[in-house]
């Protein structure tokens, strides 16, 4: 796509300088920007806050983001607030995100919810390029926004594609389409009467069935405490995926945060940094 047609774009490279991970080659323009990194609690891992300066995604908006994590570097990415998709009467919103992870690199991307309002149309395509030794933790939360009638699922559609490659081989292709006009979203086989959806991927060379079982034991009790459903499955590589149905964003955030904390403590031997957004 011609650069003139992007509503916002962002390029970021993170490398390891021998002591900590640092950024270079930062470029952003128009409606996307990234705040100068912070090292929370004296961590050696930078945290970047990605901001949409326009306050929301509008009819026909196009966004592009490219993140490179070099050898031995680690980075945490998050958003400063929810991604709000407003009504798109003429043309849908598109977002393309590419993440390139080199040897022993680790990317942790925990964004705020994507909120689709009445008559919104949203398409997101993520591509993750990993090496055998690189690692990834990525989450998404989908939330129905306000409608005049008070009904959920008044958006036109939400279409999210995630492609994960390891050593240039496609190992996961996740194609999620929620289209209330053509699907009975509330029914069994879709959202099963729940209104909010959360997902996570974790890829690391130490992932095996024993670790997956341990993660599930850590989060399974939430189904007894809250009205939600949680499932975990092994990917066709050294990784797993988590799916969550709930009625509230906060429940999904709590479950995803528990998984993220488990990974930080059991895989990386560190405490999870509080992102301090508010």
UniProtKB/Swiss-Prot annotation:
Subcellular location: Cytoplasm
Keywords: Chaperone, Cytoplasm, Nickel insertion
Domain of life: Bacteria
Chief subcellular location: cytoplasm
GO molecular function, one term: nickel cation binding
Pfam family, any one: UreD
Listed GO CC annotations: cytoplasm
Physiological role: Required for maturation of urease via the functional incorporation of the urease nickel metallocenter.
Self-association state and partner proteins as the record states: UreD, UreF and UreG form a complex that acts as a GTP-hydrolysis-dependent molecular chaperone, activating the urease apoprotein by helping to assemble the nickel containing metallocenter of UreC. The UreE protein probably delivers the nickel.
HAMAP family: UreD
The family this protein is said to belong to: Belongs to the UreD family.
Protein name: Urease accessory protein UreD
Organism this protein belongs to: Staphylococcus aureus (strain NCTC 8325 / PS 47)
